[in-house]
Amino acid sequence: MVLDLNVESPGGSAATSSSSTPPPPPDGGGGGYFRFDLLGGSPDEDGCSSPVMTRQLFPSPSAVVALAGDGSSTPPLTMPMPAAAGEGPWPRRAADLGVAQSQRSPAGGKKSRRGPRSRSSQYRGVTFYRRTGRWESHIWDCGKQVYLGGFDTAHAAARAYDRAAIKFRGLDADINFNLNDYEDDLKQMRNWTKEEFVHILRRQSTGFARGSSKYRGVTLHKCGRWEARMGQLLGKKYIYLGLFDSEIEAARAYDRAAIRFNGREAVTNFDPSSYDGDVLPETDNEVVDGDIIDLNLRISQPNVHELKSDGTLTGFQLNCDSPEASSSVVTQPISPQWPVLPQGTSMSQHPHLYASPCPGFFVNLREVPMEKRPELGPQSFPTSWSWQMQGSPLPLLPTAASSGFSTGTVADAARSPSSRPHPFPGHHQFYFPPTA
């Protein structure tokens, strides 16, 4: 709907009237009227509309308007250039902003990919512990935090972190100082593994554990005593050295262990020369009766010179199948210790263990308590000589020490048909006292 506020005369309206224009009133009055274009007629038909005028609100791209007065120090103002056809102002502004950001980012330095620095230190990988009063260095490797040691200054801890970072992550690692400061270290760390390099860094620090002691390898135990322990490479966390009443005693115990394991180049709390002759490993001066260890597979003989303190005896049981055997049984507990025979020693050195007129002795070595030995009935035994143990049978002695018969006589008596076995209770224990 268009509201036409133009006032027209009656004479002019008759000449220019159209079908859409209402006729003048019948009384012929010359007053004006309001025309409402309700039927969508064009105002150009009446000639009352003004021509369309286009005004440029922004100057052309090449036009620059300088607003400066005479004698004024105000710099000329440059109007912004309009956007090109078909392109709005926001993409141009976003592009300009991106260019500005890209120009400022190199000036700010390389962005770190290892997260923020430690809050308690200006160096990366360094943390200050108020309990110990030391600067401790750590590095993350394969999802685990590796302890590099405690240091007296933050600068020393930062250098330890830098060397570990170069070893673990290469030359592109984020470090605290310049890479040129570690040229000598780069030549040395090539021949070391990660574990060995970490161990070297810890040895150069002022202590392994986070204890409340100023000495290396010493910490205050929760029981109130001082604990000494030493770190170990490739495996266990530390080696426990013991608890001590004083802090100095624990520090000296650590020094002795460090010198024993790492030599004279070990890092100690006190002067290593004060431990001369004090850290040598103790030798075992115990000698077992002057006997030589025999590595040959043979049956060792019991030592009958010592008695066993408890009621259990080691039964050196001699079973006999000869009718000449005595019916008397002498039972006495003997020691379970077995002396070791020298290599090449003849078995004739112990004749009292085999001296008997019975040709059918065989040895059965086992521990049988006296009160629990079962009662066995009569049984027969074979006439052959046998050792009821694993191994080859020992050779017979050339002579019977107690009988005086030769070997041939005893062998003939064993093969004679008249010597048939007689039943008698088995598993008798015969004790032969040593000869003077």
From Swiss-Prot:
The record lists the organism as Oryza sativa subsp. japonica
Location of region: Disordered: 1-123, 407-428
**Which GO MF terms does the UniProt record name?**
DNA binding; DNA-binding transcription factor activity
**GO cellular component: a single term:** nucleus
Expressed, tissue-wise, as follows:
Highly expressed in seedlings and developing panicles. Mostly expressed in newly emerging spikelet meristems and, at low levels, in shoots, roots, panicles, mature spikelets and sheaths.
Q: Where in the cell is it found?
A: Nucleus
What this protein is called in its record is: APETALA2-like protein 3
Family (UniProt): Belongs to the AP2/ERF transcription factor family. AP2 subfamily.
